[in-house]
Amino acid sequence: MQDREFPQNPRIGVGIVLMIDKKLLLAKRKNPPAAQKWSLPGGLVELGETVKDAVRREALEETGLTIEVGKLLEVVELIDKAAEGNIRYHYILLDYLASASGGTLKAGSDVSALKLFDWRDLQQLELPILTREFIARHKNLLFPTSQH
């Protein structure tokens, strides 16, 4: 697999926006970027795989859950430059709303933990800036009855 750091081309990834009991499921990442920070579960689209198939596969791999893929909420771009000015990471991330349809919630090999967060909990977390901004933009959809 092509190295994720200092890539030749942008990488396409998916994010899974999964609400369970009115709480947002986040994964604590093991690998950069955002290592040891809470963010949406997800990962890269594999060659020959549709985006929605990638969402289903990543959900199962990272959370142990089978899901129904809902609507595309947003396309997020992450372009991170190294100190020398060259591109360290370049991701195009497609974040999909999803609902759990089966399985047992269990952290996969790419994550160190999974946890459900309500709106108040999220305000106390150190989140990657793109994750925090995404949640803020979609707070009314994700937490319609919470105090914002």
Model-derived features with residue positions:
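NUDIX/MutT-family hydrolases
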Residues: 95-97, 106-137
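Acidic/histidine-enriched, glycine/proline-rich intrinsically disordered or flexible terminal extensions
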Residues: 141-148
